[in-house]
Amino acid sequence: MLDIENEQRNLLYNFINSIKEKGKHIKSQVYQDVFADFLISKKYNKTFLEFGATDGLELSNTYLLENYSNWNGALGEPDPQWHQQLKKNRPNTKIITECVWTKSNEEVEFLSSDNGVLSTISSFRYSDKDTMYNNAELRNKSFKKINIKTISLNDLIKREFNEISPSYISVDTEGSEYEILKNFNFSKYKPIFLTIEHNY
């Protein structure tokens, strides 16, 4: 029992040190990037897939990994208002502009909000009204609707990662996370670490 407690204490100590070391380079909200690096980098392939990437910098769960820890991967962002800035901020990363969804080769109506980080598939525009009312209000205050081609998470990994799951997958799609993951083949693709930001 004492050995387990010491091991847990050491892990926590090392994780806190990782946060201190990476300090100013951390872009994530709750240290997802540091934890992914801490968990994966010494044992597994340093590959990531982040979708809902916005500008690839602010609130990014993978910026630190790519730029300060030699990871590589792909970023998904369907909202055109972010594409120019995303390419500028992450010039060495593959950018996917299709909308990750349950199926590929469909078109979804996408709500491109003037409050860009809150953009989502139109059918999810009020998905967080009971839990994060301010988000729903801001999202729906001013926007435009556009049609965007879809790709499933399974097909995205098949195409961009040669059917080998990235070690870390970060999902932040403002409401559609569950539907996307419900159709994901967890038997075939086994990420080591998965973070899901949701509004429920």
Predicted feature locations:
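Phosphate/nucleotide-binding beta-alpha loop and adjacent structural elements of enzyme active sites
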Residues: 1-200
